[in-house]
């Protein structure tokens, strides 16, 4: 009984610390995601993602921040990108992966959160591209405790060679994925990756965007 009692006490005292330590180093992969697109190439398309999340612009969070994982006491620990690069870079790479799979020739362009819209559009127009994609993150973060909640607000625009917007799609909302209590860390990684793939498909397969990406006759 005495040994059982000490074992229970050890779990109660050390368990939350172990959970917190795991949360502290948790990471999510974005750069490896590939969406399934309805449109196909050829065509040379430049791609950039602009991070306009307020806590990144205010430098309260780094550009690698993708969400939080909470301890048993509900204390939040930051979750960051798997490759330690900015989230925007990972999303740019994921869009490029998706375009390449469908026969396009993507040109990833990595930009700072503090770069102006005009400057980014000029960067996208370089290199004799047929189209350009600019993804703007107004919000993107997950929050995991008993469930995983994904907060998102993103805008995708397609520009032609003259830097004119010829296609646009915005999605925003709050998605809840129950079941994180079983294994919070792995649950969050799985559902967020799947949700990100789905959001990319919702953006890129939107009729206005897909038509804008089609090569000119």
Feature locations, PLM:
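Bacterial N-terminal signal peptides that target proteins for export
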Residues: 1-10
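Bacterial N-terminal signal peptides
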Residues: 9-20
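A structural "domain/chain start" motif
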Residues: 22-98, 208-217
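Surface-exposed short loop/turn segments
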Residues: 23-35, 112-165
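Generic short beta-strand segments
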Residues: 50-53, 136-140, 172
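Short secondary-structure boundary motifs at beta->alpha junctions and helix caps
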Residues: 70-86, 162-214
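Extracytoplasmic/secreted envelope proteins and their assembly/folding machinery
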Residues: 88, 92, 96-99, 121, ...
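Short beta-strand->alpha-helix linker/helix-N-cap micro-motif
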Residues: 96-117
